[in-house]
């Protein structure tokens, strides 16, 4: 299979690069920035991409690739920090920009002459690109020339033109992998298909086939258990692994007391439709007792992760493997296991797990984004009712009840959230939104109901649109709709007298509040 390797220098967008490549039908793999040239040669990639990163190339411990990668006979593309690393290696100069550039910028193509069009920018006009950098290239390396510029970055795109490897090393100061770059997909296609000569041969079906074969070989005659919640991720993971293991996969559904209204009953009904080997465990009292008086979201996540494992270990027999529906966004927001990406928060499926666990992990979806998981699920005949569910965090409502968690506070949140979701479905808005939910805030506010003064809870409604969970924009729901939802919640849910709507995008905010 043709493949592309992305070296991770710490950008929060690194996995997006891999995703965009896969959208072109080409398999991509992310490796640490320090992977040796020899190790890369053994993998035989058809192209190499250097990601962006949060550091400066002049920092004392700035990550730098093996210098011998430039001797590999494959095209190389550097993005943002990747461009700067290439430029520094070849003798160019990088300096702190007097004006940092974050967001959209107008890019203008620079042509040496009418007959010397850059292969990278073939059929790409002047257009909008997405910038996210503090440093910038100030002096070209010898043998390179400019192919694009912006008002603040005169050396916005460069490529080599002399000596061995002509038209084989390229650099971009902007991010083609981000949707805001108008012709980002076309640019990556030019690099991978036209320049590297790669024939697309990767697809969700080929992923399924290779993953089933991998799991069969990994598990052999042993057995596995699956932490299944009824959500998209765990359900698709369970069905995929069951295709490899059959009855050797034992699925465990844990009612942790942190689910949405009537969710436990609905989940069990849906899972039976999948024909999975299922055991249900009611551990709600255990989870709530361990979360009593815990306020820190990080502690909540770690407690929930440890408790999940404890419950599993009490209900296993001879299983040696644990299946989880971990996705790329889970990994990137917790810690980059493949490079120096900065940690945002611990995810239940990743860093929240105890280090000394008896079960070996199988994470079949770890390299996929949410939309790719849905495509895989569709091919595996997972019901649409499951595939269209909005994302739900592993720690459940514990991270939507801000502050301490109790059954009483959870019940208040459940009722409010049920009204919000019910109205979204009634108004045919649910499937138009990536994710929607309600957050119970750790404050009480003054209100008036009838002739009485109230001092009760406030909630925040959150609805966002996204394609992959890496970036998200708040959903512009109609004002009349929001007013109707607010009115229902305040009148029908005892203990709430104020409803707010979250209009924060990601970044700078994350989708979940905790």
From Swiss-Prot:
**Which positions are catalytic residues?**
80, 175, 177
Q: So what EC number does this one have? A: 6.3.5.2
Boundaries of every Glutamine amidotransferase type-1 domain copy: 3-201
Q: Where does ATP bind?
A: 229-235
Tell me which residues make up the GMPS ATP-PPase domain: 202-389
Signal peptide region: none
Catalytic activity annotated for this protein? Answer: XMP + L-glutamine + ATP + H2O = GMP + L-glutamate + AMP + diphosphate + 2 H(+)
* Molecular function GO labels: ATP binding; GMP synthase activity
Pathway membership: Purine metabolism; GMP biosynthesis; GMP from XMP (L-Gln route): step 1/1
List the keywords (alphabetical): ATP-binding, Glutamine amidotransferase, GMP biosynthesis, Ligase, Nucleotide-binding, Purine biosynthesis
Q: Keyword ATP-binding, does the record have it?
A: yes
Alphabetical GO CC annotations of the entry are: cytosol
List the Gene3D superfamilies.
3.30.300.10, 3.40.50.880, HUPs
Q: Does the record's keyword annotation contain Cell cycle?
A: no
Concerning InterPro entries, the annotation shows: Class_I_gatase-like (IPR029062), GATASE (IPR017926), GMP_synth_C (IPR001674), GMP_synth_GATase (IPR004739), GMP_synthase (IPR022955), GMPS_ATP_PPase_dom (IPR025777), NAD/GMP_synthase (IPR022310), Rossmann-like_a/b/a_fold (IPR014729)
Q: Which HAMAP family match?
A: GMP_synthase (MF_00344)
- What does the subunit comment say? Homodimer.
PANTHER family according to UniProt: GMP SYNTHASE [GLUTAMINE-HYDROLYZING], GMP SYNTHASE-RELATED
| Protein function | Catalyzes the synthesis of GMP from XMP.
Q: What is this protein called?
A: GMP synthase [glutamine-hydrolyzing]
Q: Which organism is the protein's source?
A: Chloroherpeton thalassium (strain ATCC 35110 / GB-78)
């Amino acid at each position: 299979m043709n493949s592309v390797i992305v070296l991770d220098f710490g950008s929060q967008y690194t996995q997006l690069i891999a995703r965009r490549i896969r959208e072109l039908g080409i398999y991509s793999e992310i490796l640490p920035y320090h992977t040796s040239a020899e190790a890369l040669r053994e993998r035989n990639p058809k192209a190499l991409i250097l990601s962006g990163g949060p550091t400066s190339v002049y920092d004392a411990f700035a990550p730098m690739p093996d210098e011998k990668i430039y001797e590999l006979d494959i095209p190389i593309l550097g993005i943002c920090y990747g461009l700067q690393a290439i430029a520094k290696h070849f003798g160019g100069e990088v300096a702190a920009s007097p004006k940092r550039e974050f967001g959209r910028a107008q890019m203008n193509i620079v042509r040496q002459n009418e007959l010397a069009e850059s292969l990278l920018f073939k059929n790409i006009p002047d257009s909008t690109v997405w910038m996210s950098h503090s440093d910038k290239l100030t002096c070209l390396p010898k043998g390179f020339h400019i192919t694009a510029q912006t008002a603040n970055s005169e050396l916005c795109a460069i490529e080599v033109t002399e000596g061995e490897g002509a038209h084989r090393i390229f650099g971009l100061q902007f991010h083609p992998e981000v949707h805001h770059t108008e012709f980002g997909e076309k640019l990556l296609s030019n690099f991978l298909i036209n320049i590297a000569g790669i024939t697309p041969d990767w697809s969700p079906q080929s992923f399924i086939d290779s993953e089933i074969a991998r799991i069969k070989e990994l598990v052999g005659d042993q057995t596995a258990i699956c932490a299944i919640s009824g959500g998209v991720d765990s359900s698709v993971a369970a069905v995929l692994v069951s295709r490899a293991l059959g009855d050797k996969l034992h699925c465990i559904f844990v009612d942790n007391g942190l689910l949405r209204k009537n969710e436990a009953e609905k989940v069990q009904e849906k899972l039976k439709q999948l024909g999975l080997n299922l055991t249900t465990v009611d551990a709600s009292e255990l989870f709530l007792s361990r979360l009593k008086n815990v306020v820190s979201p990080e502690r909540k996540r770690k407690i929930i992760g440890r408790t999940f494992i404890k419950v599993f270990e009490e209900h296993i027999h001879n299983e040696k493997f644990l299946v989880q529906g971990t996705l790329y966004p889970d990994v990137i927001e917790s810690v980059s296991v493949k490079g120096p990406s900065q940690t945002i928060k611990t995810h239940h499926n990743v860093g929240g797990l105890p280090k000394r666990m008896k079960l070996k992990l199988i994470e079949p979806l770890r390299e996929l984004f949410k939309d790719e998981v849905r495509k895989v699920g569709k091919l595996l005949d997972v019901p649409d009712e499951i595939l269209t569910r909005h994302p739900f965090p592993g720690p459940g409502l514990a991270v939507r009840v801000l502050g301490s968690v109790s059954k009483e506070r959870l019940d208040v949140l459940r009722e409010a959230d049920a009204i919000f979701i019910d109205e979204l479905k009634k108004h045919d808005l649910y499937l138009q939104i990536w994710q929607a939910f309600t957050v119970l805030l750790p404050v009480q506010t003054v209100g008036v109901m009838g002739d009485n003064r109230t001092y009760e809870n406030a909630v925040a409604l959150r609805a966002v649109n996204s394609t992959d969970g890496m970036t998200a924009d708040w959903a512009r729901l109609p004002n009349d709709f929001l007013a109707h939802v607010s009115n229902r919640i305040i009148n029908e849910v005892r203990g709430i007298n104020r409803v707010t709507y979250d209009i924060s995008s990601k970044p700078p905010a994350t989708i979940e509040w905790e």
